[in-house]
């Protein structure tokens, strides 16, 4: 039996490390950091955002987590995220997966999820 995406990402602990590193990468990315740095002023919001990301990726990857956050359109509505910003975020995700030595098929699976959400994030 093949492993789930959740298992291939290292389960809850692996996903938590990946989420932490992706958020850090976003905060250092000149194209999108203005959207993330304000979270540093609200540690409670930063913690909640990371939890939602962990739960979203965990549930989507076949893990036991339950995502209880808003829908992607509701979360991103009014932010006017450009395609360039979206791709900058994708680049951060891919670089983080490389950092964690995630195999190519798992990278493709994560990328497929990310691309499937593009219409719910960009210019909504």
Each predicted region: which residue ranges?
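Core of compact, soluble alpha-helical bundle domains
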Residues: 1-124
């Amino acid at each position: 039996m093949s492993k789930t995406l959740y298992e291939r990402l290292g389960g809850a602990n692996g996903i938590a490390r990946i989420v932490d590193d992706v958020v850090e990468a976003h905060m250092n990315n000149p194209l999108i950091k203005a959207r993330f740095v304000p979270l540093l002023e609200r540690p409670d919001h930063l913690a909640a955002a990371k939890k939602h990301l962990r739960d979203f990726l965990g549930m989507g990857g076949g893990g036991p987590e339950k995502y209880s956050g808003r829908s992607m359109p509701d979360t991103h509505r009014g932010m006017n995220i450009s395609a360039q910003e979206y791709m900058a975020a994708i680049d951060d995700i891919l670089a983080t997966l490389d950092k964690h030595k995630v195999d190519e098929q798992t990278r493709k699976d994560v990328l497929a999820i990310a691309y499937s959400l593009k219409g719910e994030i960009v210019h909504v």
